[in-house]
């Protein structure tokens, strides 16, 4: 990479500019990816904490997508699933988004209740204490963010839909559709659901049993339900589907722009060096050596720019995560960085045609 390194030393300003541009693009992609991860966590971390093999919801009408907020599992559908996979493997779950109040403070929350079956603890999502107090008819459990927003501690009284509940425990960090979670007993949730215009039927069934897609399709057809598994479970939260789709498209566009910018720079730079490359060809340099030189040059720029961007994200990410939903880990930093490096090399590869087509006779003109 002798020639490439000499080019970098000779044109420090140009290479510094493109390196800074790559770093800024890495920062944009990295921060957007971290924000996407943080928003996803604030959207569906409670759903993920259920660790269900499948989440059963009522079948949507027409071309609509299945949504937990509009799903209502009829008793006969629940009974059919229990008969097919075992009653102990099916847990009814109810979710209601509503306002909770304490003194003059009111905030939006998601009430989560579950029937017998899987042990979901206090119902407040991940990071619950092992000795968390389970909700009862008059007691609720608050996630940490719900308690902070309402300004309450264990033993305080909050009001939900005109009824007072005692805070039995503050535990867990769960969110549902960007609002903090409050765990409620199954009987209290059913009563509240009916009082606020609902049916009292569960929004979903958690299936903790491995069944094939064919078996699930057969049960769904008989019960008029849908039962997504894996990542598709998270799409049952409507805001997650639109949010991740929008942010994912932005990340993809930024990565494509990065490849275009790097490719354009090296294309122009290679065209400006056409005569130098022709001289090297005339002196006997093989094309393979010139190609390695050009690829090494672009890899150097990408490695420095992407590495600097990742370093800044790793330093700044933990600091901003306290005020905005931001996740800083290998999936939101290293993975986008490696992908940007790969796309940048692909973009730079389009400039290699000028290297392979350089005419040694130009050096004699």
Report residues per predicted region.
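Membrane interfacial helix motifs at helix-loop boundaries and amphipathic/re-entrant anchors
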Residues: 40-45, 49, 64-65, 230-253, ...
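Alpha-helical transmembrane segments
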Residues: 5, 9, 14-15, 27-55, ...
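Short cytoplasmic-facing helical segments at TM-TM junctions of multi-pass membrane proteins
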Residues: 265-292, 362-364
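Transmembrane alpha-helical interface segments in multi-pass membrane proteins
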Residues: 279-325, 331, 335-343, 347
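Basic-flanked hydrophobic alpha-helices used for secretion and membrane insertion
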Residues: 97-238
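Peri-transmembrane interface segments
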Residues: 220-260, 268-271, 275, 279-280, ...
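Membrane-proximal extracellular/periplasmic loop immediately following the first transmembrane helix
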Residues: 45-98, 110
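C-terminal membrane-exit region of the final transmembrane helix in multipass inner-membrane proteins
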Residues: 3, 336-365
């Amino acid at each position: 990479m002798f020639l490439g390194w000499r080019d970098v030393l000779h044109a420090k300003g140009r290479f510094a500019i493109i390196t800074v541009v790559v770093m800024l693009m890495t920062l944009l992609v990295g921060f957007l990816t971290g924000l996407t991860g943080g928003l996803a966590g604030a959207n569906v971390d409670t759903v993920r904490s259920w660790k269900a093999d499948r989440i059963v919801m009522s079948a949507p009408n027409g071309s609509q997508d299945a949504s937990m907020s509009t799903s209502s599992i009829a008793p006969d559908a629940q009974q059919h699933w229990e008969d097919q996979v075992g009653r102990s493997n099916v847990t009814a779950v109810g979710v209601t988004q509503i306002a909770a109040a304490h003194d003059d403070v009111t905030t939006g929350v998601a009430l989560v209740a579950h029937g017998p079956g899987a042990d979901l603890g206090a119902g407040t999502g991940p990071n619950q204490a092992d000795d968390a107090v389970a909700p009862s008819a008059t007691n609720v459990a608050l996630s940490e963010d719900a308690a902070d927003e309402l300004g309450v501690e264990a033993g305080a009284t909050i009001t939900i839909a005109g009824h007072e509940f005692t805070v039995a425990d503050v535990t867990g960090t769960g969110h549902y559709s960007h609002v903090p979670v409050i765990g409620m007993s199954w009987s209290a949730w059913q009563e509240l659901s009916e009082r606020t215009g609902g049916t009292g039927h569960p929004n979903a069934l958690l299936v903790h049993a491995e069944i094939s897609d064919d078996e699930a399709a057969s049960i769904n057809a008989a019960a008029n339900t849908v039962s997504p598994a894996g990542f598709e479970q998270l799409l049952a939260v409507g805001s997650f589907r639109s949010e991740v789709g929008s942010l994912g498209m932005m990340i993809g566009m930024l990565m494509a722009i990065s490849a275009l910018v790097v490719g354009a720079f090296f294309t122009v730079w290679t065209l400006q060096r056409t005569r130098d490359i022709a001289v090297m060809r005339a002196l006997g340099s093989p094309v393979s050596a010139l190609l390695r030189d050009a690829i090494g040059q672009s890899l150097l720029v990408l490695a420095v720019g992407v590495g600097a961007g990742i370093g800044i994200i790793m330093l700044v990410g933990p600091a901003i995560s306290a005020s905005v939903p931001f996740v800083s880990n290998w999936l939101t930093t290293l993975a986008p960085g490696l992908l940007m490096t790969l796309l940048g090399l692909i973009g730079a590869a389009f400039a290699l045609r000028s290297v392979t087509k350089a005419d040694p006779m130009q050096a004699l003109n």
